[in-house]
Amino acid sequence: MAKNVVVIGAQWGDEGKGKIVDWLAEEAGGVVRFQGGHNAGHTLVVGGKKTILRLIPSGILHESLDCFIGSGVVVSPEALLGEIDELNAAGVKNVEGRLKIAPTCPLILPYHIALDQAREASRGKGKIGTTGRGIGPAYEDKVARRAIRAADLLHPEKLREKLDAVLAYYNVQLQHLHNAEPVKAEDVMAVIEKVAPRIAPMITDVSRVLNEKNKNGEKLLFEGAQGALLDIDYGTYPFVTSSNCLAGAASAGAGVGPQMLDYVLGIVKAYTTRVGSGPFPTELFDEVGVGLAERGHEFGSVTGRARRCGWFDAAALKRSIQINGISGMCITKLDVMDGVETINICVGYELPDGGKTDILPCGSDAVETCKPIYETMPGWRESTFGVKDYGALPENAKAYLKRIEEVCGAPVAIVSTGPDREETIVLHHPFA
C-alpha cells in the first residue's frame, strides 16, 4: 500500500498540480513543499471559489491538516505573510497554527530581488524569463554558504552581522556591474523586524515532524513546484529554474529518506505549454494554438504572462518519466481539447544529422535543433468538461489517453476534466 505520494509537474510547469494536491490532501496527514519559491502559483477551485497559493502548500484549505515548508524552499517572508493574510481574509482557519517552516529555509530579501531584476534587465535579448522575484540569487546564496535562513530570525544580532557581509557583496554588483541603486541595511532590517515576530512561531524542525508522522502511519503528500523540464540539471538549461524539480528532490528538500517516497504522480497537461524563453519543439503559432490558450486560460497565476501553447509532446514526457520514476500520470485539462478536429502527438524528433530520437535531448542547444515527428489522431466534438466517469468520455478522448500511455510507457491514474476538485476521474488512486 502506497503511504506517501510525491506530486511533480512533468512538463514545463503550469500543469495543474495545485488542484490535484488539494484533492489528494483529503487522505493525507501532512502536505509538504520541498523546493522552489513564490515564483509560480498553484490554483485551487473549491465549490467555484478560486484560491491561488505561491508558497503555502495546497493542502491548507483542509482545515485540520498540517502543512510544511521544507528546507529546499526559498522563502520570501513578505510574500508568505501576504499569502497568510489572504487566506485569513478568506476565512481559512488557523493558517499560522498549522503551517510549519524549516529553520534551514533560505530567505528571499530585498537585495535578492534587486539583483535578480537588474541582471535580467542587463541581458537584453538574452533574457532567460526570470520572474524577478529573487529566487535565483537566493539559491546562489545557499550554495555559496552566505544565505540568511529562517532560523536567523530568532537571533537578530547575529543576523545583522551576516547582513552587513552579504550586502557588501551584493552592492558591488548592483552599483558597478548593473548601474543600479545599492540596498541599504536599514531597509532590509526594517523588513526583517516587521516579519520576524509572526514567522518565528512557525519555525519547526520539519524533518523530525515528518519522520515522526511517517513512523506513526500518517500518509504524507509532497508537493513539487514548476516542472521537471525546468529542472536546474535536467531541464532545457539555461532556460530553467534554480532548483531541482524532480521527485528525488523531495527527499533532500523535506528532510526524509528516499525510502519514504512510495508513489510518484506526474501531472501532465493534455497539451503542452511553456512560459517565457526557451526551446519548445511542438509550439503552435496558428489558430489551434490561440484556441488552446483561450480555452485553457493560459496566463500565469502569479505573473499574468501568456503561456505558449503546443501539441502534446510524448518524447519530452518520456524524459520526465525517466528522471522522476513516475508511477502514474494525471492528465489535466482534457476538456480544453474538446472540439479540436485533428490532434497531433509528438512521438519523437528528427535531428540535424538526419537521425531520429524518441526522447528529449539534454540542454536547450540540442532541443532547439529538434523537429517534431507527429502521429495524427481524430479529435472529439463532445464536451468532457466536468465528466467524473471514465466510461462517459468520448471514444476518441479515451483513445487519445490510451495512446499517451502507450507512447510514454506510464499508466494514466487520474484525469482532470475541470478546475474544481470534484471534476476528476480516478482510475487508480495514488494512496491506494
Curated annotation (Swiss-Prot):
Cell cycle found in the keyword field: no
UniProt EC number: 6.3.4.4
PROSITE patterns, per the entry: ADENYLOSUCCIN_SYN_1, ADENYLOSUCCIN_SYN_2
Residues holding GTP: 13-19, 41-43, 307, 333-335, 416-418
Record localization: Cytoplasm
Cellular component annotations (GO), alphabetically ordered: cytoplasm
Superkingdom of origin organism: Bacteria
Disulfide bonds: none
Keyword Ligase included in the entry's annotation: yes
Residues where Mg(2+) binds: D14, G41
Assembly and binders: Homodimer.
Stated name of the protein: Adenylosuccinate synthetase
Native source species: Neisseria meningitidis serogroup B (strain ATCC BAA-335 / MC58)
